[in-house]
Amino acid sequence: MKVTETKIPGVLIIDTDVFGDHRGYFTETYSKPKYEKMGITVDFVQDNMSFSAQKGTLRGLHWQNPPYAQSKLVSCTKGTVIDAAVDIRKGSPTFGQWVSVELSEENHRQFFIPQGFAHGFLTLTDNVEFRYKVDNVYNKESEGGMRYDDPTCNVDWGSLLNGIEPVLSEKDQIGPTLEESNNQFVYEGE
């Protein structure tokens, strides 16, 4: 397994080992002792999966506020996405900055996003299956979100959309800006 630090400390790209032969392949998607050695020491308590039928589907940017904040370990098991994490911790030296990575069924890559980040992804193919491991349970009252095209963060979805309108949920179409959002995260240092 290879771990790559991104420009934002704590946000990691993980390239899993894939062992293939004429039958197909095997890859270990999670091993607590191995991930702890990489610095991922959260206790995952829930696994989720989403399916997006149409290319150009954009889900995000979302989070859960404390005390139900979630770290996420995400991967794409069918199709291809661009996945993005935005630092929304007030006072952070990287506040408002974002990083992205391509995740696909071919590259078997994972993206670790700690608590205090907004998360979203854009499907680059039809029929995308996306998986999440999270370290806290879902809590509707703790939901947070901001516009995918927030001008403060300026995540570069546009060049990936190639002029087509993204497929958005109603909630994501009318989401607030980061400044207007109910974001409750505060940077507490390293």
List where the protein language model places each region.
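Non-catalytic, conserved peripheral segments adjacent to functional cores
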Residues: M1-E106, T125-N127, V134-E190
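Short beta-strand His + acidic residue motifs that chelate non-heme Fe in jelly-roll/DSBH
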Residues: F111, H119-L124
